[in-house]
Amino acid sequence: MSTRNPRLLTLSLAIIATVAACKKTGDAPTAAAPAEPQAKPLTLDEGKLPKASVFSATDLDPGKAACGDFNEYVNGKWMAANPIPGDRSSWGVSEILGERSLAIQRQLAEQAAADKNATGVEKIIGDFWATGMDEAKIEAQGIAPIQPQLAAIDGLNDTAAIAGYIRKQAAIGDNPIFDFDAEADFKQSSMNIAYASQGGLGLPDKTYYSDADKRDVLDAYRAHIAKVLELTGTAAADAAEQAKTVIAFETRLAKASLSEEDLRDVSLYYNPVSLAQADKQTPNFSWSEFFKSQDVAAPQMFSLPMPAFHQEVSKMLGDTDPAAWRSYLRFHAVDGAAPYLSDKFVQENFNFYSRTLYGQKEIKQRWKRVLGTLNGEAGEAMGQLYVKVAFPADSKARMETLVGNLRTALKGRIENLPWMSDETKKKAIAKWETFTPKIGYPDKWRDWSGLA
């Protein structure tokens, strides 16, 4: 929605009037410029949305003893009438609300894609949706979208080239070997620092590579790796051998990784080091070069947690055959892109990760997958459209008033607590003042104009 400046409007009218008065009587009137085409307003068809799940006393099962099995007494009839859908691994009220939200988003995306006059965020959403839903083009392209990346991997013949590839992929958010992000400094929360933590495994955690009771999953993963490589054109026998290589490669990473139990200890994520100290720990991987490639200033300090993992990666850069690195990197490049490639890649990705690992019976419909990706990459852009139809400004204003009243009441209670000292009250009020309500959506949206 645009707003007009009254002073600017008045000035414009005055200029128009002056120009008109100065015209010669015989001047022909100038044709008005055609109005710019406007995007259509977004609408919502409630009739196409899933019905909300509403509690009814008839849902209670009098045939079940509430004191014996309260869950069956309250939820048994509902669960019997609402089996888990084939494209889900769980089902409940939150999932139903999620389905409704997706249905709303679908309507918005379809409208944005169909509107040739859409601009800004609406155009971004419409283009994203149209691209993701163009199955014919996706099938025709096959693996072509990632061929340049695969060609780059095929050219990795030494330690320096492999380290350079890792740096390059990290710079575009696709680090194949470790996780890298910025978070608050554990010891000084007023500033953020970089954290480089373990990664690189295709299975959920290190136990999948060693525990006997998970051997069937490891075998299925090996078969999945071979199949993915086959789909890229690798001969079956070569794909099977490369799959063994990838498993051996990841097993070595797993042995140097912390367990899920260890990862619960937040302190293990904090290992502040200087660039010089980090480079000394990983002689085959320069952190100085890494930060340069990320287009950020060299930090005085960053956190290098799980040092044994990073040291092992450095050793592998030096002692592992580049062919093994190529097999590992090639598989993960294709596997990571598989959900967005042609159907044979999508199906193979689903068969292992969703069906084998998590028991999901059916793949989600394409429109749901496209929305899932859209929300992951540009969720705030979709949110900007979503609130126009699902949470308008007057709803936000009412909630802000409600929360404001609660804050005022809380402050009053603190000030009138008889058992709290004046000094403690001052500290409590200081903490109260730091509370920033965030309701519905931000007052200032992220600027997506650079993508338009």
Write out the residue ranges for each language-model feature.
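Active-site-surrounding "flap" and adjacent substrate/cofactor-binding loops of secreted or lumenal enzymes
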Residues: 44-51, 65-137
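Bacterial lipoprotein signal-peptidase II cleavage site
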Residues: 22-32
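Extracytoplasmic/secreted envelope proteins and their assembly/folding machinery
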Residues: 57, 64-67, 71, 75, ...
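Noncatalytic, helix-rich "gating/capping" subdomain that lines the substrate-entry/channel surface
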Residues: 111-401, 405
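Bacterial N-terminal signal peptides that target proteins for export
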Residues: 1-10
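Bacterial N-terminal signal peptides
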Residues: 10-18
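N-terminal low-complexity, Pro/Thr/Ser-rich intrinsically disordered segments
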Residues: 32-56
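Contiguous, non-catalytic segments that form substrate-binding/exosite surfaces or channel walls
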Residues: 233, 254, 397-452
